[in-house]
């Protein structure tokens, strides 16, 4: 009996590990912009990697896509309604389902990237409704008007958060006078916990999960605070008023435009925002019960294109104004700026197979870049011509295919074979 019980426990543990590894979400498995790929091309033909297909019927979207081993998931806005589109690997639409109303602010196009685990898809609408869609049944399993229910408060440009799954919980940050962050049961939508209120406004950043000191800590930003929350019970472990750290003298309102997902590695946490507000590195201390500031950097004030860590360096773009920015490299350990280089304008960045993938936001130029602290070394580049609007969506790489979203269009490129 003991032997069989032991076997069952092993099976359960392995099953939980498989489930944990199967989540497809915002900016990759660890939400840090690094995609676990190998065998990708180290240079491209003059016109770029081979374009496999284009689907231009997604609806308007600034959100990225999530890709599983079975399907592709994308959110899009038609008129004032948000839809989930599910595609096969030839770019054909398998099905489509409306799940909520879009935001009422400027740039109302979808911002939330679907979070997919098994046959469940989680989304946050532009008006703060948290939704679970059952892909097997192709219908909404549950929905919670969370922004309304928890009396949330959002900043000027609305809601842009992508939901985080932690164990059996869906995490959302409505902020406001009642709470700051909430956890919903991922199977039912029932409230598991809600944190105390910091009496603040939600940012445009998405949360991450870190493991430190034997704790699971959920980290996110409001417009003023960086906070760490105990994933088990929703207690706020620590918070820091980021907006008070070297507040820009020219753009006094700017520190509240936090769009960058916190970047974590080995006990250290980096945050940044645009408009001349400094990036800050923190160190977790006291078994995760506190954090302390390590360094600041005034060069890499990333607007909304995100940052990525490769080796001991952080890469991303800074903000010069809303139309321009340069490509930067900063030392993870010291905060020293290694370079600041001009290449068209600011944009998005991810990493895979020890290369950087850089997507500038105005003209759609896309580059394969060698990560180096010495220079912004472009190996190959091409231009994205399909779609419409700003090139703000984060690229995704899955099983050797590069997915680029531009407005209503999704393009798939082969990164494993060269054209003859």
Residue ranges, per PLM feature:
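Extracytoplasmic beta-rich repeat domains
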Residues: 52-66, 96-115, 143-165, 177-178, ...
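Short coil/turn segments that connect the beta-strands within blades of beta-propeller domains
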Residues: 69-70, 118-119, 167-168, 214-216, ...
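Short loop/turn segments that connect beta-strands within beta-propeller blades
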Residues: 88-92, 134-138, 185-188, 230-233, ...
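Blade-level signature of beta-propeller repeat domains, shared across WD40, Kelch, NHL, RCC1
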Residues: 364, 388-420
């Amino acid at each position: 009996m003991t032997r069989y019980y032991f076997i069952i426990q092993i099976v359960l543990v392995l099953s939980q590990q498989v489930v944990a590894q199967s989540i497809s979400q915002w900016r990759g498995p660890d939400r840090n912009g690094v995609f676990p790929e190998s065998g990708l091309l180290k240079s491209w033909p003059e016109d770029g990697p081979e374009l496999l297909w284009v689907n231009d019927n997604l609806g308007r979207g600034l959100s990225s896509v999530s890709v599983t081993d079975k399907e592709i998931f994308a959110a899009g806005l038609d008129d004032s309604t948000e839809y989930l589109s599910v595609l096969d690997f030839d770019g054909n639409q398998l099905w489509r389902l409306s799940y909520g109303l879009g935001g009422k602010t400027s740039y109302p196009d979808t911002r939330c990237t679907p979070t997919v685990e098994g046959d469940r898809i989680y989304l946050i609408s532009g008006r703060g409704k948290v939704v679970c869609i059952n892909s097997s049944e192709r219908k909404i399993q549950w929905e919670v008007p969370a922004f309304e229910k928890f009396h949330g408060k959002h900043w000027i440009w609305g809601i842009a958060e992508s939901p985080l799954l932690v164990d059996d919980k869906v995490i959302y940050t409505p902020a406001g006078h009642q709470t700051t962050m909430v956890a919903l049961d991922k199977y039912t939508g029932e409230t598991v916990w809600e944190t105390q209120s910091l009496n603040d406004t939600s940012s445009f950043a998405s949360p991450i999960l870190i493991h430190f000191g034997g704790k699971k800590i959920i980290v996110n930003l409001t417009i003023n605070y960086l906070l760490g929350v105990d994933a088990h019970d929703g207690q706020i472990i620590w918070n820091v008023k980021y907006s008070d750290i070297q507040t820009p003298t020219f753009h006094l309102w700017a520190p509240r435009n936090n769009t960058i997902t916190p970047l974590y590695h080995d006990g250290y946490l980096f945050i940044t925002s645009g408009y001349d507000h400094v990036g800050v590195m923190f160190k977790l201390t006291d078994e995760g019960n506190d954090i302390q500031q390590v360094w600041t950097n005034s060069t890499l004030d990333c607007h909304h294109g995100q940052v990525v860590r490769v080796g001991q360096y952080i890469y991303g773009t800074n903000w010069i104004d809303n139309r321009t920015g340069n490509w930067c490299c900063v030392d993870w350990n010291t905060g020293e700026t290694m370079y600041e280089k001009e290449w068209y304008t600011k944009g998005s960045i991810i990493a895979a197979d020890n290369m950087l993938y850089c997507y500038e936001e105005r003209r759609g130029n896309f580059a394969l870049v060698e990560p180096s602290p010495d220079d912004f070394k472009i190996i190959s580049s091409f231009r994205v011509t399909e779609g419409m609007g700003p090139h703000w969506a984060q690229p995704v790489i899955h099983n050797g295919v590069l997915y680029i979203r531009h407005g209503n269009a999704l393009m798939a490129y082969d990164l494993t074979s060269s054209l003859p």
